[in-house]
């Protein structure tokens, strides 16, 4: 199998893009292991489940993050959780790639202003898949916590 991917997308922040998440995850699963495939599940619970249950989710998700080779985030629908996951991944030197539909939203300056993140704006879903191929097909991922793969359509290249 290829890379271990942590896919991040809005859950409690809104499920308007859940079908898109499902398609992206299915595409990546052809040659990779998506640790968070449940994010594409249309039937995920959107309600808080209590501190104990949420603590279990936190522990599982952060373990998956630390195990992952790369984080792929779809950020068209704003999400506090996805923002937290991105910051956590940066802290652990996990390469992060952020996709968003620029016809529907703008990213926070906290993301676009941080050169750690590879930003991939798109207008049509079909634009996502060649970029994923480039990201996931690259040989090297980490050098001092930085992405070494070629970046496409980035807002903040290093």
Segments (PLM) and residue ranges:
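Conserved catalytic or regulatory cores that recognize and/or transform ribose-phosphate-containing ligands
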Residues: 1-158
